[in-house]
Amino acid sequence: MSTRSVSSSSYRRMFGGPGTASRPSSSRSYVTTSTRTYSLGSALRPSTSRSLYASSPGGVYATRSSAVRLRSSVPGVRLLQDSVDFSLADAINTEFKNTRTNEKVELQELNDRFANYIDKVRFLEQQNKILLAELEQLKGQGKSRLGDLYEEEMRELRRQVDQLTNDKARVEVERDNLAEDIMRLREKLQEEMLQREEAENTLQSFRQDVDNASLARLDLERKVESLQEEIAFLKKLHEEEIQELQAQIQEQHVQIDVDVSKPDLTAALRDVRQQYESVAAKNLQEAEEWYKSKFADLSEAANRNNDALRQAKQESTEYRRQVQSLTCEVDALKGTNESLERQMREMEENFAVEAANYQDTIGRLQDEIQNMKEEMARHLREYQDLLNVKMALDIEIATYRKLLEGEESRISLPLPNFSSLNLRETNLDSLPLVDTHSKRTLLIKTVETRDGQVINETSQHHDDLE
């Protein structure tokens, strides 16, 4: 394995090749490799060291040192105490030149990568400035425009809620007043109904009295008819008696004319007639007076009962009219109450719908505020990620700067003069071969993070021989 291939593979493994995109991940792996050093005695120059330090967004760090590797297939050379075989020095110089050429190529590649990273850092800084400007603009807009808009809308909603509360209180007061009026009218209706029942009871009693008076009048009328019939019968009987008496008187008059003288009989008959006529007139006058008195009493009672009946009918008519007017008034109040209750239900439903709409509006505004907060938090997280990337790139730039400074200082060192070396005779075949296999210990540390918090951390050790 050549130095260039080792360095390239290590560089691709640490920083990613041209076709590999560096993607941020929630897991970070730290890989540490042990240092490999190859040396051969004190005749060689100090081992050439090359260190690569890089920091990628994924968080991978690696160090690696390599030295000039001597092949075991170099032919054995016998070195004398006072002479040097320059073929070995030529081979070393050739290999050193090749190594320097490879190092120059690698440095050129590193410079290109470094330029790309600088461009990337500048681009990320510009993006960072743009995001900061957008964040400041969003903060200013959120404080100026959205805050004022929300405050104005909240004031309007509060004003509408206060107005609706006042309207509701006014409607409730009107409802209470109407309820009191209805209760008062109901009490008045109950009183009128009681008075109506009393009037009906009085009317019923009056009707019973009228019926009794009518029965009494009919009885009296029947009695009057019977008395009139009796009077007619008595008149007829009296006339018959008078006729009989006149017949008897005439018969007696005839007999008296025969027996006695005429003037004495006439006077007697006149006296008898006068007596009977006086008795009949007296009886007739008494009967007429009794009939007239009874008829007057019955007429007066009938008139009195008729007046009471007429008054009762008038009172009943008045009570019926009052009951009808009160019934109409109660029906009107019931209609008014139903309309007010319907209006109140409609207003309550409207209030409920408007309150639900206001709650939905408030919820929507709160959701928008929450979304804006989440978006601001996301921008802040992106800004923090960009800051982390920038810090990693700053560290990488500093590492490249140290690399360049180290390479410049190493390149400025003088080459050793192999012609002036005083080597003693040594058989290279007797020397132990350089162990071309080295032991490398890999420490793989995996850290899993979520939302900036460490949720899992594992470490693994691997031994690798090359």
From Swiss-Prot:
Keywords recorded for this protein, A-Z: Acetylation, Cataract, Cell membrane, Coiled coil, Cytoplasm, Cytoskeleton, Disease variant, Glycoprotein, Host-virus interaction, Intermediate filament, Isopeptide bond, Membrane, Nucleus, Phosphoprotein, S-nitrosylation, Ubl conjugation
UniProt-recorded Gene Ontology molecular function terms: double-stranded RNA binding; identical protein binding; keratin filament binding; molecular adaptor activity; protein domain specific binding; scaffold protein binding; structural constituent of cytoskeleton; structural constituent of eye lens
Region feature (Disordered): 1-32
Tissue spec: Highly expressed in fibroblasts, some expression in T- and B-lymphocytes, and little or no expression in Burkitt's lymphoma cell lines. Expressed in many hormone-independent mammary carcinoma cell lines.
GO cellular component: axon; cell leading edge; cytoplasm; cytoskeleton; cytosol; extracellular exosome; focal adhesion; intermediate filament
Modification type N-acetylserine: residues: S2
Record InterPro entries: IF_conserved (IPR018039), IF_rod_dom (IPR039008), Intermed_filament_DNA-bd (IPR006821), Intermediate_filament (IPR050405)
Positions where N6-acetyllysine occurs in the chain: K120, K129, K139, K168, K188, K223, K235, K294, K373, K445
Effect ascribed to mutating Q208R: In CTRCT30; uncertain significance
Superkingdom: Eukaryota
Placement of covalent cross-link Glycyl lysine isopeptide (Lys-Gly) (interchain with G-Cter in SUMO2): K104, K120, K129, K139, K223, K262, K294, K313, K373, K439, K445
Residue numbers carrying N6-succinyllysine: K120, K129, K188, K294, K445
Region Linker 1: start-end pairs: 132-153
PTM text: Filament disassembly during mitosis is promoted by phosphorylation at Ser-55 as well as by nestin. One of the most prominent phosphoproteins in various cells of mesenchymal origin. Phosphorylation is enhanced during cell division, at which time vimentin filaments are significantly reorganized. Phosphorylation by PKN1 inhibits the formation of filaments. Phosphorylated at Ser-56 by CDK5 during neutrophil secretion in the cytoplasm. Phosphorylated by STK33. Phosphorylated on tyrosine residues by SRMS.
Glycan-carrying positions: S7, T33, S34
Region Linker 12, residue ranges: 246-268
Modified residues (Phosphotyrosine): Y53, Y61, Y117
Family assignment from sequence similarity: Belongs to the intermediate filament family.
Protein name: Vimentin
Organism: Homo sapiens
